[in-house]
């Protein structure tokens, strides 16, 4: 299982893409690596995702800051928004928390849509606290936000 967050967005050899199970760039990385002018909305995220799938990636999830995230695996596509009333204090570890939530979902054998939701919820918890290590969500915090948001 290969989960790849391409930060920073440096050129990736085309032959490497076929080994990636979950490719999770942010909007800027998706734009840079796809060659598209912008990846600012769901339509553009789908365009970028198709480019990565054409290169061999199995699933793409683009994190889209305060918009949420977009995922496409060649069969299903989902745009998941963030829960209401998330107050951003520090976004320094949001991507890392997203990856952790996604990984938790994968380890639990969840469906694709739930993987994106797990990542979004984890990132939302992280941005509400300052710092990197201290902002990583606990299971208790994760479960609480999951229940509160209904996701």
Locate the predicted segments by residue.
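Conserved beta-alpha-beta core of the PfkB/ribokinase-like small-molecule kinase fold
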Residues: 1-47, 67-69
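Conserved phosphate-binding/catalytic region of the ribokinase-like
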Residues: 11, 15, 42-151
